[in-house]
Regions:
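Short, surface-exposed beta-strand/strand-loop-strand elements in extracellular ectodomains
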Residues: 34-43
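C-terminal membrane-anchoring or membrane-association module
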Residues: 238-241
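Short, threonine-centered small-residue motifs that mark membrane-proximal processing/anchoring sites
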Residues: 2-5, 9-24, 218-231
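Exposed aromatic-hydrophobic patches
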Residues: 57-64
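Solvent-exposed serine/threonine-rich low-complexity stretches and specific carbohydrate-binding patches
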Residues: 45-52
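Residues that act as N-cap/strand-start positions at coil-to-secondary-structure junctions
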Residues: 31, 53-57
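Accessory carbohydrate-binding/adhesion or oligomerization-edge regions at the termini
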Residues: 23-25, 30-32, 66-221
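A generic "binding-loop/recognition-motif" signal
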Residues: 33-34, 234
């Protein structure tokens, strides 16, 4: 039985091509209004890749030698007016795998709901103020420890293709970003507190304080289904006598 388990482990290695223990990344994104990109564990950031504050710019950052267990984090803030959103494409060059905003796996934590617990801070987070890395780390640890990560929200048609129909609304980001997939979606968090009516932008992409600051995250890499199954079977067989 042990020989079978060893055979199964060998199959995993063969199927994954000797999976590297570190990943390289090349990312393109923008945020209306401000953001910082980090990599790290489920509890804290360990590397700051960069940031930006001009939604008209497509920002590009790279990261090399990141652990395969890393999460990719994007901390954001807005000016609470006009429009707000986050869009990007993230390419794992080691695996030749690409993920974009709007795909499954993305999560968001609205830190503004928990400012007293996080920082002993009453009231709301100030508009147009980015959190420090230490504050982002505190938010990540609190969200993970209390299972507070939720799925982000979007609005139909708000992708990186300005020709996608969005009636009766308007597309206020009129130019496609050249290195972001056209299927990538503008995402944000919907607090459910904006009850206003607008013919320009839908909720949650029109300006409003949806419990900012926000921290988005996505797992950097997960085992392919066949790999996960073989690993599980191998572990069971290896443990049997």
């Amino acid at each position: 039985m042990r020989s079978l388990a060893l055979y199964m482990c060998a199959c995993v290695i063969a199927l994954t091509g000797g999976r590297a223990l570190a990943d390289d990344w090349n990312v393109y994104l923008t945020v209306d209004n401000q953001f910082d990109v980090y990599y790290g564990t489920s509890m804290t950031t360990t590397f700051a890749a960069g940031g930006g504050s001009n939604w008209m710019v497509e920002y590009n950052f790279s990261a090399t030698g990141r652990p395969t267990t890393d999460y990719l984090y994007v901390a954001t803030s807005s000016d609470h007016s006009g429009a707000q959103g986050f869009i990007g494409t993230f390419h794992n060059t080691t695996l030749n795998a690409t993920l974009s905003t709007g795909t499954t796996g993305w999560q968001v934590f609205p830190a503004g709901q928990h400012l007293p617990q996080l920082f002993g801070m009453p009231g709301s987070w100030p508009a147009s103020q980015m959190p420090t890395q230490t504050q982002v780390d505190a938010a990540i640890a609190y969200a993970t420890a209390n299972s507070l990560w939720v799925a982000p929200s979007t609005a139909p048609g708000y992708d990186n293709d300005p020709s996608t129909p969005i009636a009766p609304y308007s597309f206020i980001w009129p130019t496609a970003l050249p290195n972001i997939q056209t299927s990538a979606q503008w995402i944000w968090y919907d607090s459910g507190k904006d009850t206003s009516v607008s013919s320009v932008l839908p909720i949650p992409l029109r300006g409003f304080n949806h419990d900012e600051f926000l921290v988005f995250r996505v797992p950097g890499a997960v085992p392919e289904p066949v790999t996960a199954v073989l690993l599980g079977v191998g572990a069971v067989l290896f443990g049997r006598r």
